[in-house]
């Protein structure tokens, strides 16, 4: 019987597309993040998030880029839940200015190659020897 600890890693990104000068299309900041959770805790964590959404009548997708003051207490309690949990580990990479990236020099001219290299950097610190890991990547929109 295999006694490895089982974890799920949920990944998401913000503003991952190549930088464009038209600021309505793309921000210059990019973030790639991952949340590691023991498989045995996923249902409990989901229930807590659903409870908070119901409590604060928050029916939309949770998006940090769409915050407004009327949602302050929901996000305060959500952050408190995440940061007080001993069952969640978060790792992220922030690229402060995509205009400074040199894909021609470091990534064979490919923004996509850079994207996957950065995800490797995020994930490598969350994966341990002798554990079973399932990684869930967000759908990668290539057009927005």
Region locations from a protein language model:
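Phosphate-ester processing/binding pockets and catalytic centers
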Residues: 1-144
